[in-house]
Regions:
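Surface-exposed beta-strand-to-loop junctions
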Residues: 3-7, 74-78, 139-143, 180-185
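C-terminal helical subdomain
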Residues: 141-186, 195-197
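Mobile gating loops/cap/lid regions near enzyme active sites that modulate substrate access
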Residues: 127-142
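Rossmann-fold NAD(P)H-dependent dehydrogenase/reductase core
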Residues: 1-131, 211-219
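Alpha-helical packing segments of well-folded alpha/beta enzyme cores
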Residues: 92, 96, 159-163, 201, ...
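Intracellular terminal tails of multi-pass secondary transporters
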Residues: 195-219
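C-terminal/domain-terminus segments
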Residues: 109-118, 179-190, 194
């Protein structure tokens, strides 16, 4: 979050890693998936400002602003801008999930399900690698003590096991278009239901990733 990083393709790195790469991979794999395959996007509760997670609320105007932030004016200071890019990228995961569900229902004979998942805060990960050293220490060692409590603070192993159950549990075989905080189904943020944003994200993602019609059954 300390400064803006870019992928080798020229896209802002948070956006490229958290959304665009997943969008491209899913589309390239759809034709090879079994008829009852499952897709789970790893999102975050930080996409919803009502969660009061201590992160700036996401702002979605157009996907290209996310891909090329330095070319677009922003009032955010550097640290705040980086954290807002993170929460907005997680909102993109929700947009992508909803749009993918709609397109699969309209354009595919397969019964592929698509859901989104919030693994919670995982102190062991490298999310805070660019934070101040004191902040990194607190996040890694102090918050790590709270994984034994009911709050949505989890070890990587626990979140990984929950994610695996989302794509293997027979009780969820036909569940699609849902969002889970751990194993609990939750509503997504008010902004996440914006159909115009969902379609804009999809269309611009096709353009940015240079996805071709012969590469995806949804084009």
């Amino acid at each position: 979050v300390d400064k803006t990083y870019y992928s080798k393709e020229g896209f802002e790195e948070t956006f490229a890693v958290n959304h665009l790469s997943h969008f491209l991979l899913v589309n390239l794999l759809l034709d090879r998936m079994t008829k009852d395959g499952r897709i789970a996007f790893v999102s975050s509760g930080t996409h919803d400002p009502k969660k009061k997670a201590g992160m700036p609320e996401p702002v979605y105007k157009n996907e290209k602003i996310l891909a090329y932030p330095e070319e677009n004016y922003t009032n955010d200071k550097k640290g705040l801008a980086g954290r807002r890019r993170y929460t907005t990228s997680k909102l993109c995961n929700i947009y992508c999930m909803y749009e993918l569900v709609d397109r699969l229902n309209q354009m595919s004979a397969k019964n592929i399900t698509v859901n989104a998942f919030d693994p919670g805060l995982m102190p062991e990960t490298g999310l805070a690698r660019t934070y101040h050293p004191i902040s990194r220490f607190v996040l890694k060692y102090f918050l790590g003590l709270f994984v034994i409590f009911p709050a949505n603070i989890n070890s990587v192993a626990k979140s990984g096991k929950t994610l695996a159950s989302l794509v293997t549990d027979n009780q969820l075989k036909h569940v699609t278009g849902r969002y889970f905080e751990g194993k609990k189904e939750m509503k997504t943020s008010a902004l996440s239901y914006n159909k115009e944003n969902q379609k804009n994200l999809w269309n611009v993602s096709v353009e940015l990733s240079q996805l071709q019609k012969d590469e995806s059954v949804l084009l």
